């Protein structure tokens, strides 16, 4: 089972995997651990990652990048309309009102949703992980910004489903960083001690996030998060682009914004310049050849000028930091360390601002680029049964307060309740109790819309169905469990109606406790149970809110036992004590049964099942097309490689191994094949290239084989000759009565002599015949045949010549009744054969003699 963590960023992606040796960040086919978040569409296939980024300037209209922030947003979203102006590709509205990306693919116009585009990127990451792990990848943990809303998170999960990934958890970036930091720390305070507070700061390509986390041994708790979704390294690049656009317009009379290719080149050069200024404070040049209208442009900038240009952006850094400290009620002296990650934190001015705010140096112990991916892989390993990981619980925080609104039975007034406050622990469940006579609706929304970087405050509308009054006409008690799950998504997980069923108590039967239905999952108990009851014009309509406890993957749920109906009447207790007494007359009893209720969810953003299946099918077809195109290109490259290889070697090492007539014919075929490749063979089916390759190999393989045989033949013949000499010498020694071989039977040795003579005769005949052959003719014998002869000779001779001499048994020792052993004369020979000294008797020990057991002392 694979364990993979995916950091899917706006600009680039990182893949971390868990192995026996720990967590490792893996490289792609270009030996680069960073995979650009870029997809390029061509007439035959898609290009994803590094290869797509290389085509970004030449195929700007069909190359898609910076699409992460489009998840879960409508086309008329103000953010989408603003970003649309800066993109090289077209954004158009989808039928469902979402964002569509229009590109030319397979020589046709195609419209892809953001989920499909992200699925394409995930396909590439999945393929890279599978190539590295050598096994299929299904389970994973994917990172998302902590400020992603419910709709955006659902959109990312849909993208993972399209590509067949089972996302075990959508993990907030900062929580992943905190896990990567804390799980390796051995000096964390104990659970009963004051926790260590660490602030994590992440400035990536497009956003700025901060979080405060409390660490104890074996656990971390996110105290709070703050962010600026529109402040990142991209904004610093844009400041440089704006500056140089104005300079080039004045200096060279060139408007870089009028041509998208020129603007993209300027963006790339400005990003390089920004990185250089992080390590150099001197003036640095910016040179672009043939920028526009065949004109070269040049400019320069230093770090101080850059910081002055970006002063407005640098001031924004402190805003989320102030907000975080206010929300968590922390003081700067309570913060033990400040860990920074993200590519943009390498800018010296950014580091300086953060350090100045906290009054202490920032720490860079984590890998700024890979920390998120490594944290995701650790979380995946914790959730996976295939890995045993040190016990470490993770408690996240809800970034935005969530409220519920509902209509009363009278439909005159509305009830509102905030079920999850800002920075509330997550994952978490709560049980709300309603008194209703019929179905009712609940609407979830974000309580503070101004703090949410998303235009829609509504999360969704949930209809609790099949609710009915009790048989006596009273309102039914409906329990609704609301939950923020491991993905950070709000949902109504279950709803049940408490139904009172009158029954008769049978003789001798024990009284049933009014518990939940056994086939219903028990609710989870909390550390603190609280009941919130507010005054309302209609009695009994305000729900009773029961905190149902935090659910994490590390802590299993425990049964809920707080219901009033669970109390056993005193009369029933008396009956339990009087089991042996004769039964009384039957009396009515009220049995409480929990009935599961269906909940219909109407969410702000969720792909329908039919649409999702269509996207899955489309992605499968594109994957197959990419595979076929790769195989076609591989076949074409094989033909081209074959042409160059044989043409080069026919005038070199292969020249002696082909006759002049065949040489000219083969060269002519190679030239014709090369011309065909660059003309009508430029775009042919895979089979056409396979046929061409077979035609070339039909003429080239015999030449290649003759060359290889000529190279290998002397070596194997020499090996055969050495074995023949070896066995011939042993046979001669045997005939000369050598003591080493006097134990071998003569009939056995005759077999050796016969085999040696036969093989020697065969070798002489072969060598004589081969000497008469020219090099351009096929050899008389192949090297594998000679190797077979060597093996055959060894099989016959080796068992005979390696026969061991029979062992000479040592004579028995004669013992006297009370004296030492008396050895026979032959005992000396026995000792020499055994190679061991006789043991001392009667505990006698002599100095300067070695013991029987040697010990090496360190």
From Swiss-Prot:
GO terms of biological process kind: chaperone cofactor-dependent protein refolding; protein folding
Modification(s) after translation: Phosphorylation on Ser-509 may be important for regulation of the HSPA8/HSC70 chaperone activity.
Residues with the N6-acetyllysine modification: 471
Protein name per its UniProtKB record: Heat shock protein 105 kDa
Positions of post-translational Phosphoserine modification: 509-510, 558, 810
GO CC field: cytoplasm; cytosol; microtubule; nucleoplasm; nucleus; protein-containing complex
Compartment list: Cytoplasm
Keywords per UniProt: Acetylation, ATP-binding, Cytoplasm, Nucleotide-binding, Phosphoprotein, Stress response
Known role: Acts as a nucleotide-exchange factor (NEF) for chaperone proteins HSPA1A and HSPA1B, promoting the release of ADP from HSPA1A/B thereby triggering substrate release. Prevents the aggregation of denatured proteins in cells under severe stress, on which the ATP levels decrease markedly. Inhibits HSPA8/HSC70 ATPase and chaperone activities.
MF terms in GO: adenyl-nucleotide exchange factor activity; alpha-tubulin binding; ATP binding; ATP-dependent protein folding chaperone
Domain of life, per lineage: Eukaryota
Family per record: Belongs to the heat shock protein 70 family.
Positions of modified residues (Phosphothreonine): 562, 816
Entry annotated with the keyword Cytoplasm: yes
InterPro entries recorded: ATPase_NBD (IPR043129), Heat_shock_70_CS (IPR018181), HSP70_C_sf (IPR029048), HSP70_peptide-bd_sf (IPR029047), Hsp_70_fam (IPR013126), HSPH1_NBD (IPR042053)
Biased composition regions of type Acidic residues, renumbered to the chain: 504-515
Quaternary state and interactors: Interacts with HSPA8/HSC70. Interacts with HSPA1A (via NBD) and HSPA1B (via NBD).
Lineage: Eukaryota, Metazoa, Chordata, Craniata, Vertebrata
Modified positions (N-acetylserine) in chain numbering: 2
Basic and acidic residues composition-biased segments: 564-585, 806-815
Species in which this protein is naturally found: Rattus norvegicus
Region (Disordered): 500-585, 801-858
Compositional bias segments (type: Polar residues): 533-555
UniProt xrefs under Pfam families: HSP70
Chief place of localization: cytoplasm
């Amino acid at each position: 089972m694979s364990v993979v963590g995916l950091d899917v960023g706006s600009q680039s992606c990182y893949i971390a995997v868990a192995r026996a040796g720990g967590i490792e960040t893996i490289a792609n086919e270009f030996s680069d651990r960073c995979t650009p978040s870029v997809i390029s569409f061509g007439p035959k296939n898609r290009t994803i990652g590094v290869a797509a980024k290389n085509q970004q300037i030449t195929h700007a209209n069909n190359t898609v990048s910076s699409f992460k922030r489009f998840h879960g947003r409508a086309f008329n979203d103000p953010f989408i309309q603003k970003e649309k102006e800066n993109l090289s590709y077209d954004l158009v509205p989808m039928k469902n009102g979402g964002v569509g990306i229009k590109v030319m693919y397979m020589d046709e116009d195609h419209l892809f949703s953001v989920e499909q585009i992200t699925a394409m990127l995930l396909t590439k990451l999945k393929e890279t992980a599978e190539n590295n792990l050598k096994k299929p990848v299904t389970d994973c943990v994917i990172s998302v910004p902590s400020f992603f809303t419910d709709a955006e998170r659902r959109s990312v999960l849909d993208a993972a489903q399209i590509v067949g990934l089972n996302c075990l958890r959508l993990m907030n970036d900062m929580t992943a960083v905190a896990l990567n930091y804390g799980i390796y720390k051995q000096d964390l305070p104990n659970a009963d001690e004051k926790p260590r507070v660490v602030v994590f700061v992440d400035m990536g390509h497009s956003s700025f996030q901060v979080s405060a986390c409390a660490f104890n041994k074996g656990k971390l708790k996110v105290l709070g998060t703050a962010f600026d979704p529109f402040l990142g390294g991209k904004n610093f690049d844009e400041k440089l682009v704006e500056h140089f656009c104005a300079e080039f317009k004045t200096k060279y009379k060139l408007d870089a914004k009028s041509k998208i290719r020129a603007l993209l080149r300027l963006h790339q050069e400005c990003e390089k310049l920004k990185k250089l200024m992080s390590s150099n404070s001197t003036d640095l040049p910016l040179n672009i050849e043939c920028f526009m209208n065949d004109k070269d442009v040049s400019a320069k900038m230093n770090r101080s000028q850059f910081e002055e240009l970006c002063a407005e952006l640098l001031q924004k850094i402190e805003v989320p930091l102030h907000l975080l400290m206010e929300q968590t009620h922390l003081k700067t002296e309570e913060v033990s360390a400040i860990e920074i990650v993200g590519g943009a934190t390498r800018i010296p001015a950014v580091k300086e601002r953060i350090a100045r705010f906290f009054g202490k140096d920032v720490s860079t112990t984590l890998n700024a680029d890979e920390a998120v991916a490594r944290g995701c892989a650790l979380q995946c390993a914790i959730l996976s049964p295939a890995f045993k990981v040190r016990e470490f619980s993770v408690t996240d925080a809800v970034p935005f307060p969530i409220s519920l609104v509902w209509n009363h039975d009278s439909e005159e007034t509305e009830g509102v309740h905030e079920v999850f406050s800002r920075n509330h622990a997550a994952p978490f469940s709560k049980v709300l109790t309603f008194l209703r006579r019929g179905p009712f609706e609940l609407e979830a929304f974000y309580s503070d819309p101004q703090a949410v970087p998303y235009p829609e405050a509504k999360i969704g509308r949930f209809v609790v169905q099949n609710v009915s009054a009790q048989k006596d006409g009273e309102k039914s008690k409906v329990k609704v469990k609301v939950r923020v799950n491991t993905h950070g998504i709000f949902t109504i997980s279950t709803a049940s109606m408490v139904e009172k069923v009158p029954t008769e108590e049978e003789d001798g039967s024990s009284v049933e406790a009014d518990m939940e239905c056994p086939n219903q999952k028990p609710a989870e108990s909390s550390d603190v149970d609280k009941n919130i009851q507010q005054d309302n014009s209609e009695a009994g309509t305000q729900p009773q809110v029961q905190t149902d406890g935090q659910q994490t993957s590390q802590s299993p749920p425990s049964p809920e036992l707080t219901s009033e109906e669970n109390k056993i009447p005193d009369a029933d207790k008396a009956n339990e004590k009087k089991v042996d007494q004769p039964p009384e007359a039957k009396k009515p009893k009220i049995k409480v049964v929990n009935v599961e209720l269906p909940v219909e969810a109407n969410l702000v953003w969720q792909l329908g099942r039919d649409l999702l299946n269509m996207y899955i099918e489309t992605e499968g077809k594109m994957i197959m097309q990419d595979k076929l195109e790769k195989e076609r290109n591989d076949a074409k490259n094989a033909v081209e490689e074959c042409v160059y290889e044989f043409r080069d070697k026919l005038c070199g090492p292969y020249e002696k191994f082909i006759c002049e007539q065949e040489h000219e014919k083969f060269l002519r075929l190679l030239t014709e094949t090369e011309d065909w490749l660059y003309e009508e063979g430029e775009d042919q089916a895979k089979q056409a290239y396979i046929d061409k390759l077979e035609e070339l190999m039909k003429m080239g393989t015999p030449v290649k084989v003759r060359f290889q045989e000529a190279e290998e033949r002397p070596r194997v013949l020499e090996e055969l000759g050495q074995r023949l000499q070896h066995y011939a010498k042993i046979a001669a020694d045997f005939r000369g009565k050598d003591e080493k071989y006097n134990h071998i039977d003569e009939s056995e040795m005759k077999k050796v002599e016969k085999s040696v003579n036969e093989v020697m005769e065969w070798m002489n005949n072969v060598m004589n015949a081969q000497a008469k052959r020219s090099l351009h003719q096929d050899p008389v014998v192949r090297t594998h045949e000679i190797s077979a002869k060597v093996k055959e000779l060894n099989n016959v001779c080796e068992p005979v010549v390696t026969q061991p001499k029979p062992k000479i048994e040592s004579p028995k020792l004669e013992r006297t009744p009370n004296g030492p052993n008396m050895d026979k004369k032959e005992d000396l020979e026995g000792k020499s054969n055994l190679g061991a000294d006789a043991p001392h008797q009667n505990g006698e020990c002599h100095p300067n003699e070695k013991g029987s057991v040697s010990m090496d002392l360190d």
